[in-house]
Amino acid sequence: MSSLIRRLNSLRQDLWRAARGQGQKATVQHYAQATGRRQPPPQPVALATTAMRVTAVTHETPSAISLTLVRQDGADIEFLPGMFFTLVLNIAGREHRRAYSISSAATLRTSATITIKRVPDGLVSQHLVDTVAVGASLNVLGPAGAFTLRPQAGRQRELLLIGGGSGITPLMAILRSVLAIEADSRITLFYANRRRDEIIFADELDALVRQYRPRLRLLHVLEEAPAAWSGACGRLDVEQCTRLLTQAYGEDLPADLRVFQCGPAPMMEAVRTSLLAQGLAAEHLQQENFLPGRREQALANSVAQPLTIVAADGQRWQGYAAAGQSLLDAGLALQAPMNFSCTLGGCGRCRVRVLSGSVAMPGPHGLLPEEEEAGYALACIATASSPLTIAIAPPTPL
């Protein structure tokens, strides 16, 4: 992982250079906002991307594809299972960022595969599914993310993976990696979909179950099940999850059980409720939120708002957040060492704590309700709605 850390440190240096380059521009924009002049919506901060080339396109379902990527410079791609890339695309002259999880095993070094499902009315997902072909070049940020597991040879774990729809993607990377590296670990997968033809990786999952039984168990849930379906039927709600847990583990969950889940927010809330009711410790549950792209937000403040950023060591940065400007972009313009990853409100890496003032933050997002109640916000999507002071965590490797 040392080369990965070096590349991430290089990315942070690029970030600082980008922030310094935007400092004067931000001051002009803040002054114009304070004088009441109308300004265009602030643009995302420009960050250094990695050029990658598509070497394979696999059609997983009628609405989902997998893209195998290699670096244009030929370097290895190092990542932990569960991480994602943020694709930076220009469509019709406008920049769009979307985060897509890596689905391939971390045992690979020369390539990485991301899986993309077409979203109704989703401009970027439709563009990728319909137009990207072998040989295409893509600019990406990352890999990044905190929804990760580090496989270790000789380690023995009891893992429960719970996915809904395209939420199987990061779980597939975890599953493939653990099966390949940890010969004594056991995995149970609950996988919920609307219809049978929407099951991503269906054939491979069946093959893996045959190959690794009894180390791997798979329990499907379909909302619209065919007549001959032998699996669970209906939504993966609290009652359904409780039934599946009993089917998989009996009356008591294993003491060492660790759970990773990814899928629609209602499903994940239901699963969380069921697991905690069955005695799982909250710290033994990790979840990844699949969210839409960077939002077109209504301006939460009509004029610039004073902003103070406080680091753990007491260092301060003071300036203004422009109307509609995210706290992340405002902090970078002030050259504060802001943590961030997906820039979409999903991963939680940009979490800051509001010390005074108020913010506007659209949902859905990656914070838990108790985190919001404790005063936390996601800097990449939150905007200042009053004079604001926030605390940031020390810069940390991704």
Could you describe each region identified by the protein language model?
Residues 1-10, 127-313:
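FNR/FR-type flavoprotein reductase catalytic core
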Residues 36-137, 141, 154-158, 193-195, ...:
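Ferredoxin-reductase
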Residues 90, 143-144, 355-358:
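Short, surface-exposed secondary-structure boundary micro-motifs
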Residues 224, 382-398:
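Short flanking/linker segments adjacent to small metal-binding domains or redox-active Cys/His motifs
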Residues 303-339:
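C-terminal accessory/binding modules appended to enzymatic or scaffolding proteins
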Residues 336-361, 369-386:
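Local cysteine-cluster metal-coordination motifs and their immediate loop/turn environment
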